[in-house]
Amino acid sequence: ILNYKHAILKNEKPSCAFRSIRLDLSDRKARLKLFKQLNNECKKALITTEGLMIYLTNEQAAEFAVELSSHNHFHRWVFDLASPGLLTMAQKEMGPTLKEGNAVFQFAPDEGEEFFLRYGWKNLESKSLLKTAAIIKRLNAEMINFAAYPEPEGPKGSFPWTGVCLFEN
């Protein structure tokens, strides 16, 4: 995935200091070393963990959130979050395939974005991927109909939702 993203972004010029780092985030020792190094090198960081959180358990997500919030220069964090409803649907549709690849979707907290409050992260904004895809005309006709339905406020519960969330520490 990182090779694909690097290829797409290779000619782009970021408007800030940008680093893409390959690291097995399940290696806690290496992760903590990296966080310390980055915190020492920057004054104000936006951490992006696209595609990561859904593979974690609730406990791992909490640990990760605490570790990030303990660094005073990690001001913002952006990642994609799924609702329990979407997790159930994805497990039903893709579960066997994911298990074959030793990848299991696990994290979709019942309390939604509020899960992260107790770990030092305040949700600033959440954008539905479905609604955003409709706005930029990236959906087929059937999905456009789904995008027209209103979404619940607060925790999404059994409603199938995924979005990108921006948090502040």
Positions of the model-derived regions?
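Alpha-helical subdomain
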Residues: 1-169
